[in-house]
Every structure is written in C-alpha cells, then in structure tokens.
Amino acid sequence: MMAFRVAVIRSRRVFRISMNLPLRSFPLMCVNPRKLNIELDLNSGKILESFRPEERFPMMSTFKVLLCGAVLSRVDAGQEQLGRRIHYSQNDLVEYSPVTEKHLTDGMTVRELCSAAITMSDNTAANLLLTTIGGPKELTAFLHNMGDHVTRLDRWEPELNEAIPNDERDTTMPAAMATTLRKLLTGELLTLASRQQLIDWMEADKVAGPLLRSALPAGWFIADKSGAGERGSRGIIAALGPDGKPSRIVVIYTTGSQATMDERNRQIAEIGASLIKHW
C-alpha cells in the first residue's frame, strides 16, 4: 500500500478524518515513491478526509507563493512598493532563471520579480525577493506570525531543493501549507487588492501545464504553483474549482520516488483527475 495524505479544511474550521486507501483507489500508473501525499482543502465543507497530513515534505518552489505573500504584506504595510526597481548583476544569477537573465541591464520591479517567481518559477527572482524581506528566516518568521509554526524556509535557491531524507530544512506539512495558503488567498492578512494579485499570479502559472491543469474539464478555474526537487521530489499547491471560480485548495507533494519527471507529472495529473471525478 502506498501512503496518501489528504486534508479537507472548511473556511472557518479544520476537520480531519484519517483513513488508509488501497492504491487502486487512485488510478496511478508507473508509481513507486516512498512517500506521496494529497492535501485537499474544501471551503464548501462537504467532504472531510485526510491521509496522514502531518508529515514533512520539501516545499521546493511552492514556497514562492508564500514568499510573494510576504512581499505583498510589506506592500500593504507601506514597507515596500511593487513598482520599485531592483538592479542585480551576473553574479546574482543562479540555476534556472529564464526571466531575470534577460534583464541584467535594466533590472526588474518587485511586481515583475513576483510574477517571474510564480509564473516561471525563476530562482534568481525568488532570491532577490527573499533579500527584500530579510532572507529565509524572515519568511519563516512571517509564517509564524500567521500562525503557521510548521512551515520553514532555511536556505536559498537552488540549495533548498536538496530534499534530504529526514532533513526538516525547507519543509512543510500538507495541513499547514493548505491552511496558510487559504489564509493568504481568503483571509484578512492581505488587502483585497493584494489577495487578488497573488491569485492572479498563480492563475498565470506557465510551468505547471502537465500537472493538475492537464486534468481540468472545460470551464474550471485553477491558480497553482508547482515545485521540483532532488531525490524524486515533486509538488503542487492550487486553488481550483468548477464554473470558473476556486472552491477548494489542493496540495500534493511526493518525495523519494524513482519515477522520471514525466512519470511524476502523470501521477499528479491522475490524482487530480480522481479528485475532480469525486468532487
């Protein structure tokens, strides 16, 4: 049996029912990860299930949504401006920086960096944004102030993607991530304008096509952020729903898999198809 973790969270209270499902409950093919989880946050509150939602997984690039949430919080407080231009050099560029590498001469605004970090998963953009808030520890402190005492960021891109077994650095638990994401997207932590901006960036994600988006029926809404790391790690956090509007938050992480990247993408797409079928 493979371990799955799913949590369903109402808009005001968290309810969890723990259970184990056989592998045949989800139509997965070519799967052999040591760990795989699903985290489902249901604002409608009709289905309440969880599968071991309190085990740590590497966040990988899914942390970039939390980072931009922290940046927007500073904007709301008058401590930052989305239009502020940040200049950087060749020495600042790290692996996988498809947007920032094109703007060495003119720099990028904070708004443009957040867009690059979320929609293209640009690693240099994330590091530059981390610098604006004071580094990984300050992002962790921001999350603690939100009530999330689980999620932590310790390193910068790309080292945070190592995904070493039993290493708590740069990890979260599915329940914590779903609750924190819901607070950022629907709570009072950010202004309405900032909440809308965050979900707009996620809706414009350009690198998660083979995952949940590939399983969506016509007319469904999705705003998401994927992540990939070492040691077979893959993940996605998303707000999605029918009729063109989000109604649930889904968080899926896997690590320790021997599957190829394409196989891991198919795993997540197939999980998404099962969730949608039983919506």
Predicted feature locations:
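Structured C-terminal helix/loop/strand segments within mature extracytoplasmic catalytic/sensor domains
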Residues: 22-30, 47-48, 55, 131-132, ...
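Active-site SXXK
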Residues: 57-86, 250
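Conserved catalytic neighborhood of penicillin-recognizing serine enzymes
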Residues: 93-128, 136
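Flexible glycine/proline-enriched surface loops and loop-helix/loop-strand junctions
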Residues: 50-53, 109-112, 120-125, 157-165, ...
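Short amphipathic, helix-prone segments within low-complexity/disordered or flexible regions
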Residues: 3-8, 14
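Short, glycine/proline-biased beta-turn/loop segments that scaffold the active-site neighborhood
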Residues: 77-102
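Mid-domain, small-residue-enriched loop/turn segments at the edges of structured enzyme/sensor domains
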Residues: 127-186
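Short, conserved catalytic-motif segment at the N-terminal edge
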Residues: 34-57, 80
